[in-house]
């Protein structure tokens, strides 16, 4: 008899624990259901990188003096500097400069120690390619300035979509009753788009119709 009661008590305790754990899991799920979406719809939306973001390296051929400081400070000796000695001027003459971004760790040492500031970090991070050899950028490819996220016409930044009300930086700290909170990008654009103005053709038609009515 006591064994049966003990089994019933253990079963009841296990059932209560299971219900409590299930309720805790659902509470976390319901809490996230009340929050607005924060997923960036890449590539149509992009986050603006920080000012000190270490992206693809930009290289200025005219400033380089072929000192090879970037090669010495690189942890993996990555930059390849091709130069010849000009016997007339007794100075190095740069022929080619290349960096393989398939191997680069973007530590920024080359940019930090360059004496002529011919190297700089950009905000470009889209370096995916089907062929790893195409990631080996020469001085021509390194000299191209990337298109900024803020000026790319194919990208609408999150700030322009007005996901967050003015003055708000934390997406989870915004009340659900605030204007535009939790709306989709299409809905936000509808609220921001001004109404269409009547064209001159329509105005002419309306004026002619009014004259006919007066006649």
UniProtKB/Swiss-Prot annotation:
Pfam families: Fer4_7
Domain 4Fe-4S ferredoxin-type: 55-84, 95-124
GO CC terms of this entry: plasma membrane-derived thylakoid membrane
A molecular function GO annotation: NADH dehydrogenase (ubiquinone) activity
Obligatory cofactor(s): [4Fe-4S] cluster
Cofactor remark from the record: Binds 2 [4Fe-4S] clusters per subunit.
Binding site for [4Fe-4S] cluster 2: 74, 104, 107, 110
Compositional bias of kind Basic and acidic residues: 169-180
Catalytic activity annotation: a plastoquinone + NADH + (n+1) H(+)(in) = a plastoquinol + NAD(+) + n H(+)(out); a plastoquinone + NADPH + (n+1) H(+)(in) = a plastoquinol + NADP(+) + n H(+)(out)
PROSITE patterns, alphabetized: 4FE4S_FER_1, 4FE4S_FER_2
EC top class named in words: translocase
Keyword set includes Iron: yes
Entries under Gene3D superfamilies matching the protein: 3.30.70.3270
Name this protein carries in UniProt: NAD(P)H-quinone oxidoreductase subunit I
The organism's taxonomic lineage, starting at the top: Bacteria, Bacillati, Cyanobacteriota, Cyanophyceae, Synechococcales
């Amino acid at each position: 008899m006591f064994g049966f009661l003990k089994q019933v008590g253990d079963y009841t305790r296990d059932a209560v624990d299971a219900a409590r754990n299930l309720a805790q899991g659902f509470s976390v799920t319901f809490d996230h259901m009340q929050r607005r979406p924060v997923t960036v719809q890449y590539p149509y939306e992009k986050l603006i990188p920080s000012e000190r973001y270490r992206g693809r390296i930009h290289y200025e051929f005219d400033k380089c003096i072929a000192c090879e400081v970037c090669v010495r400070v690189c942890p993996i000796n990555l930059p390849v500097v091709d130069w010849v000695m000009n016997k007339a001027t007794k100075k190095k003459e740069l022929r080619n400069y290349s960096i393989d971004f398939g191997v680069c760790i973007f530590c920024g040492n080359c940019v930090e120690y360059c004496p002529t500031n011919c190297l700089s970090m950009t905000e470009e991070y889209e370096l995916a390619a089907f062929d790893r050899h195409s990631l080996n950028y020469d001085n021509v490819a390194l000299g191209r300035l990337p298109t900024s996220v803020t000026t790319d016409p194919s990208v609408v930044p999150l700030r322009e979509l007005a996901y967050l009300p003015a003055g708000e930086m934390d997406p989870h700290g915004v009340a659900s009753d605030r204007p535009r909170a939790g709306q989709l990008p299409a809905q936000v654009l509808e609220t921001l788009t001004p109404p269409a103005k009547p064209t001159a053709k329509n105005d002419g038609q309306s004026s002619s119709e009014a004259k006919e009515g007066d006649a």
